[in-house]
Amino acid sequence: MRIDELFWNDENVGHLWSAHQVTPDEIEEIIFGVEGEEPTYRIRRDGDFYCISGETGSGRLLNMVGELLENNRFRVFGARDMNQKELRAYRRGK
């Protein structure tokens, strides 16, 4: 799966912050990488949705859920810090 652009609106930005204090910038760092580095996220499909795990430029480890839209745009529904089980699985798969 290729992601060229992230879809943001007031609803998903507000939910990310109010529920888990995650910013759009953190999501973009995971998907597109930080300057001079390639992104290193893991992705898996769960029905119509995708679960993406990755690390921000500051080292925060997040899981996010969203859907692929037309033209390789991706809408994030939610994101949160990884729990211990997810963290172990992410580190094993890197």
Protein language model annotation of sequence segments:
Residues 1-94:
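Ribonuclease/tRNase effector modules and their secretory precursors
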